[in-house]
Amino acid sequence: RKSLIFILKSEASTSALRVQQSIDPDTGRLHKAKSTDNSRMILALTAIGKDVTNVGGHNLLAGLSDLEFVKYQGNNGPIWALLALDSGNYPVPSGGTTTRQALIDEILSVQTSDGGWAISGDRADSDMTGMALTALAPYYKKDPTVKQAIDKAIARLSEMQDDDGGFSTTYGDGKYIATSESTAQVLTALSALGIDADTDSRFIKNGGSVVDALLRYYVNGGGFKHVMDGEIDGMGTEQAYYALTAYYRFLSGKTNLYDMTDIIDMGGDVVTVEPTVPAATEPAQAAQTNIPWWIIAVCIFGGAGWGVVIGIVLVPKLNKKKD
C-alpha cells in the first residue's frame, strides 16, 4: 500500500507541475468557467502537502476569490469552494468577493422546497444533497440557520432512501435509478455529520442500512459497480472507496473526509503531529483542465488507505452477510 501511495503522490506532483502551465496568471484560475477545477486541485495538493498558494508562483486560492465566478458553475461551485477552503483552514483570498459566509449563504439559498439540494430545479437529488451536507457539516453547531437547513435535509434524505437502504438519482428524465454513487454521497455526508449510517434508525429500511446498500455494489477482487446489473466502474469505485474512507474516519474519531487540518496546517504543509480524536459530532437529530480522478483519490485515500478501509469496514460486513 505504501508503494502505491508513493507512486500516486509522485504522479500527482508531476501532474501539478503540468497544471502550472494551465493557470491563468491574472486570475489564478485553471479553467475559464469551472471554479471546481481550482477547488479540487486545492484538495488534492493539500492532501499531499503541497503549497496551494505557490503552484509555479501562482496562488490557487486566488482563483476562488470572485464569488460570481464560483457561482457561475451552479450549485457545485460554492459547495466545492467551501470544501477546498476548509480542507486546510485556508484564509479567504483577499481583495475578492468570496467569503466563507457568502459561500454558506449561497448554498442555503438554493435549498429546495422539499428540503434537499438539486443540480437544477426544485426537487431534491440525493447526490447534491449529500455534497451540500458534507460542505455545511462543520457549521452545524456554529450557525442556527445552517443547523435548521441540515436537519430538514436529513429528514428529506431519510424519506428519499430506497426500500433496500440505498439511494437513487435521476438524469433529468424523471426516472430514478439506484446507483452506488448516490449511496456513496449520502454515506459521506452522514459520516461528516457524525451520524452512523449503519445503525441510525432513520437510515435503515427493511433491515438494510446505507452501508449495506453500498457494499452490494462491490465486486469481489475488484471495485464497485455503477448500477447493480453493471460491471466494475471507475467513478463508482472511486466514490464508494472514499465514502467508506469517510465512514472509517467517523468510526475512528478522526476529522471528516475533506478536513485535513488534523495533519496539515493552514499553509498546506504537512506537520509531524499525531491526529487527535475530536469531540464527537452532534448528530443532526440532537442538537479547461480536467483533474484526473486518481489525483483526487490521493486526497481521499491518503487518510486511511484502501487496505485499511477494506479490512475494517468492508470485510467484516461482507462476512456478516455470509453468516
What do these predicted ranges mean?
Residues 1-2, 26-53, 70-96, 100, ...:
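An alpha-helical repeat/solenoid feature that recognizes helix-turn-helix modules
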Residues 302-323:
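C-terminal membrane-anchoring or membrane-association module
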